[in-house]
A protein has these predicted regions:
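A positional "C-terminalness" feature that preferentially activates on distal terminal regions of long
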Residues: 1-426
Length: 426
């Protein structure tokens, strides 16, 4: 059993613990292989031999245990093991690590096999602990200007025999921003970007008037046919996307008053034209959506029903309320291309629905692997750029299958997508 003081819970990573101590590792691998359902398990008989081979090939602690075990067994046999196939409940208890979170008096707060589950369950208490040990003035609210000098990118405070670590960030509170402490750097970065965006918008004139003056009537009309809420919400989405683009161009979030001043001047000077450019692209996207939806209405040929359902699900992931900021400026042109690929697919599907279904099943297989892989990641890891990139690779895979003539920016295949997932560390 691993004892973890509550204030240190956010600093402990699960990776590595599941490998057990070296003396129990072989026994654990054998037990895991034997836990597989019989149709899968028979590919790895005798289990002790495969356990020995795995331990001879794998680099302990380099990857999470199951990631490494699945990868090496697949290399040895060509058999892919679904994550759900492992039956941890059949592994003897003495081979499993237990995590116990304790308070200042060493009293048990909670314990379990999953460190991430404990982090999720005790997140509020960890946050309270961070706020309690923070110096006065670190956390603030109701801010409308950058009036706090330099914002530290990390914060440490000694408590008893250990150091409590937190990550400060600006937090978007709509009419103002706040400074809050986060228990991990991923959430800090995500909050900081949104909070910085809000503080910039609070300190520059709105681009809406300029947008109405400069946007062609056709584009204005396209925005008013927005099926995803009020047009003003869509315009706000375009503005937020524009600020994000300019923050990105400047090198990302800033942490000093001087840096904010320089970024503010850049955004004030360039945001109007940037938002007009974005709104024109959004109008093209919404027009493509409108045209596709027209084709999806009416009687459905049963041979095309599954393909059409797949298209609707794909579109829901591409264009939704908040998609402009959600997808980001760099993806607007890609989003339009993916919609154009859907139009090409509809043309081909009407001619050969069986070929469409065969290609769709290949994409579905990759999507299922991606979803399983995504579910394994800590929640705060799923929004990181390298993780999000996999989703866009699957969109490119669709283009290569259904509308190859449109081209992709790089070579793509189902195998390349799976390899890219393997190379990303949790």
């Amino acid at each position: 059993t691993v004892h973890i003081p509550l204030p240190l819970l956010n600093q402990i990573e699960e990776a590595g613990f599941e490998w057990q101590i070296p003396g129990l590792r072989r026994e654990l691998i054998i037990a895991l292989i034997k836990s597989l359902p019989k149709p899968v398990r028979r590919n790895f008989v005798p289990a002790p031999n495969y356990a020995e081979a795995f331990l001879g090939r794998a680099a302990p602690l380099e990857l999470p245990l199951l990631d490494s075990l699945e990868r090496e067994l697949r290399k040895m046999t060509g058999v892919t093991i679904d994550r759900e196939a492992w039956q941890w409940d059949q592994v003897p208890d003495h081979l499993k690590i237990t995590f116990r979170v304790v308070d200042d008096k060493n009293k048990k707060l909670q314990e379990g096999r999953s460190l991430q589950a404990l982090k999720d369950a005790l997140k509020g208490k960890v946050q309270e602990t961070l706020s309690a040990v923070a110096d006065d003035g670190i956390e603030q609210s109701g801010l409308h200007i950058w009036s706090f000098g330099t914002l530290a990118e990390s914060y440490e405070q000694k408590r008893g025999n250990y150091k409590v670590k937190a990550w400060p960030a600006l937090v978007d509170e709509r009419d103002s921003v706040a400074i809050k402490l986060f228990d991990n750097p991923q959430e800090q970065q995500q909050a900081m970007w949104r909070g910085l965006r809000r503080l910039l918008l609070l300190n520059i004139p709105s681009p809406i008037k300029y947008l109405h003056e400069k946007l062609p009537n056709k584009a204005k009309l396209g925005l008013y046919f927005n099926p995803y809420g009020k047009v003003l919400d869509l315009i706000d989405d375009c503005i937020s996307c524009g600020v994000d683009k300019l923050i990105d161009e400047a090198g990302g979030p800033v942490w000093t008053e001087e840096g904010f001043s320089q970024l503010h001047d850049k955004v004030r000077a360039e945001l109007n034209d940037t938002v007009v450019e974005i709104a024109k692209q959004v109008e093209q996207i919404l027009t493509a959506v409108f045209n596709i939806n027209k084709r999806l209405k009416g009687r459905v040929d049963m041979t095309m029903a599954l393909g059409l359902s797949d298209i609707k699900a794909q579109m829901a992931g591409l264009v939704y309320r908040g998609f402009v900021t959600g997808n980001g400026f760099r993806r607007l042109g890609d989003t339009l291309r993916y919609l154009q690929a859907i139009e090409k697919r509809l043309e081909k599907m009407a001619i050969d629905p069986h070929r469409d279904r065969a290609q769709m099943l290949k994409v579905e297989s990759v999507q299922q692997a991606w979803q399983q892989w995504l579910n394994k990641l800590p929640p705060n890891r799923r929004e990181d750029d390298d993780v999000r990139e996999i989703r866009w690779m699957i969109e490119e895979l669709r283009v290569s299958f259904f509308a190859q003539q449109l081209g992709t920016p790089y070579p793509i295949s189902d195998k390349r997508v799976l390899q890219a997932m393997e190379q990303i560390t949790p």
